[in-house]
């Protein structure tokens, strides 16, 4: 006969068994605060759920940032807008609203080597993730190498689907 998990004995254990890990961690502090501030049970439950949702959102963003493979990059705030003079700031600002994602349009950044295309792409991926979108960055060389290394048409099709999954795929 298969063994059953031990029966939870505390409220924190119940939370963990239900998958509410962050609630289990915050439970004692929030109960103490609720007692001190004389919260109603509904307010306490709302605070617990807000803490759980906030922690899950933070975890989701962190996971997406890791999956995006951004590496190190210069923040957009540090970009030197006066050089190159050819860059059209209003266009870049419009791209960073991410409206093109909802419209399912493409953005292509074309410029000579060393003018900040990669930095803009990394910041765009970062911005998309913070806005709740899935996003990934990779080089064109890595993409081609990966796709050409697939042994069968089925494997290639499966790999293509992984690249089509994110809302934003930035190819440098």
Regions found by a protein language model. Give the residues of each.
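N-terminal pre-Walker A segment at the start of P-loop NTPase domains
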Residues: 74-96
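Short glycine-rich substrate-engagement loop in P-loop NTPases that contacts/grips substrate
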Residues: 85-90, 136-164
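Walker A/P-loop nucleotide-binding motif
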Residues: 104-120
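Conserved P-loop NTPase "ATPase switch" module shared by AAA+ and STAND
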Residues: 163-172
């Amino acid at each position: 006969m298969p063994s059953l998990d031990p029966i939870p004995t505390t409220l924190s254990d119940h939370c963990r068994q239900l998958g509410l890990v962050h609630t289990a961690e915050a439970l004692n502090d929030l109960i103490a605060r609720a007692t001190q501030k004389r919260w109603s049970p509904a307010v306490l439950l709302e605070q617990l759920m807000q803490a759980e949702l906030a922690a899950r959102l933070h975890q989701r963003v962190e996971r997406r940032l890791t999956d995006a493979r951004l590496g190190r990059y210069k923040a957009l705030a540090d970009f030197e807008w006066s050089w190159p003079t050819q860059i059209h700031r209003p266009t870049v600002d419009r791209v960073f609203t991410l409206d093109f994602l909802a419209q399912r349009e493409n953005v292509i950044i074309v410029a000579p080597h060393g003018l900040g295309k990669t930095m803009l792409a990394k910041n765009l991926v970062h911005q998309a993730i913070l806005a709740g979108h899935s996003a990934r960055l990779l080089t064109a060389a890595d993409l081609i190498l990966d796709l050409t290394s697939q042994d069968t048409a089925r494997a290639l099709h499966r790999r293509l689907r992984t690249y089509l999954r994110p809302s934003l795929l930035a190819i440098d």
